[in-house]
Amino acid sequence: LVGSEMCIRDRVIGIGETGLDYFYDTSPRKKQVEAFRKHIDASRESGLPLIVHTRSADRETCEILREETGKGAFSGVIHCFSVGREVAETALDLGFYISLSGIVTFKNAESLREIVRDIPLERLLVETDSPYLAPVPHRGQRNEPAFVRDTALFIADLKGVEFVEIVSQSGNNFFIILIN
């Protein structure tokens, strides 16, 4: 992305994936923050949603999103949500959507499932993050788009709603945020 002028092209529907990833700590944090803020500016200026990736950087991500919202509104999605409650609450407070991947189906993801139970359907998306993070029962395999069904089935059961409701609402949310 060279700048917000790149966003006016007809085929661009979002800015990102962008954000902070401190997990491996191989990219200088200062540079990540600078790039994240530039992408937020592009989102704000273009009106296109921001697709946010955050890993091992919950506090900093929330601080930046709050600060930047104070400079002017922008919308977005927390992509492949697998982090803490603070990120979910901040995102929802700022009008963002939260996208869930196969991680929610993993045996060790109970703390994530507790948060997901509280995410309103009107702010939820379902994704694959292919080729990574295949849901149970495909865990360990290369993820593919068809497996999104397994994630959606799991989320429907978790939230006590029909599968069709998850699919319908996630689809509607996709069009609201990304196709607008």
What are these regions (language model features)?
Residues 1-8:
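Short, small-residue-biased leader/transition segments that mark boundaries at the very start
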Residues 9-94, 106, 114-115, 119, ...:
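Divalent metal-binding pocket/active-site signature
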Residues 95-109:
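His/Asp/Glu-enriched short active-site or ligand-binding loop at hydrolase and phosphoryl-transfer sites
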Residues 121, 135, 156:
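Short, conserved catalytic or interaction motifs in soluble domains
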Residues 129:
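Conserved beta/loop motifs at nucleotide-recognition and modification sites
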Residues 148-180:
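Mid-to-C-terminal alpha-helical segments outside catalytic/metal-binding sites
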